[in-house]
Design a protein with these regions (language model features):
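A conserved beta-strand/loop capping segment in the N-terminal third of enzymes
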Residues: 58-115
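Conserved FAD-binding catalytic core of PHBH/FMO-like flavoproteins
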Residues: 143-189
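A general structural signal for well-ordered alpha-helical segments in protein cores
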Residues: 52, 56, 115-116, 171, ...
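A short, basic/flexible loop-to-alpha-helix module at the beginning of a structural domain
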Residues: 1-4
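N-terminal Rossmann-like FAD-binding beta1-loop-alpha1 element of flavoenzymes
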Residues: 8-32
């Protein structure tokens, strides 16, 4: 009889950890998912994500894309500008690989809350994933594989002495959430010219 594979411990139930745990669980792997936050706290972050076509394929393969469609806002153009050189690059649907042109945009904006709500529901429903939210991480067995997905300032990485490096490239991005009520598309277009 073949030994059963070890349980995989995923530390961190944000988008990266939750997607990892779901992907492993869907493959039949036993997973223990830990996060010190509650489900409500995990969903409460005020942030949005730019979803690319590679992310779309991942979400499709995990069975999430269809259920996120109402929360996805497509963008069909991307205007990149360099203030130092006054250079400008415009991306549109024609710049995509042909396999990606039949979709609604060159990318999508997805709010954090609907993504996390769906991920947590799917994880809860997956019999291969044991969620431990807002409680101490269970002690992994000696042969457990541990995935540290506990953020950019990972306490796991720090505790294990795993070194890392980064490059400050002095670029930034400003995003804002704007609620539009009773404003027509033609009215918005008139102000763009």
């Amino acid at each position: 009889m073949a030994p059963s594979p070890p349980v995989i411990h995923v530390l961190g139930a944000g988008p990266t950890g939750a997607l990892t745990a779901l992907a492993l669980g869907l493959q039949g792997q036993r997973v223990v998912l830990f996060d010190p936050l509650t489900a409500s706290e995990l969903q409460a972050r005020s942030r949005a994500y730019a979803i690319t076509h590679s992310s779309r394929r991942l979400l499709t393969n995990l069975g999430l894309w269809h259920d996120l469609r109402d929360a996805l806002v497509p963008f069909r153009d991307l205007d990149l500008r360099d203030g130092a050189t006054n250079a400008r690059v415009l991306f549109g649907q024609d710049d995509l690989a042909s396999a990606n042109r039949d979709h609604d945009g060159i990318g999508w904006i997805l709010d954090h809350r609907p993504l996390m709500k769906l991920l947590l529901a799917r994880l809860e429903a997956n019999g291969n994933v044991a969620m431990h939210l807002a409680e101490p991480c269970p002690d992994p067995s000696a042969d457990a594989l541990i995935v540290a997905a506990d953020g950019p300032r990972s306490p796991t990485r720090e505790a294990w002495g795993i070194r890392h490096w980064g490059i400050r490239y002095r670029q930034g991005c400003l995003t804002a959430k704007v609620a539009l009520r009773a404003v027509s598309y033609t009215h918005l277009r008139a102000h763009e010219t």
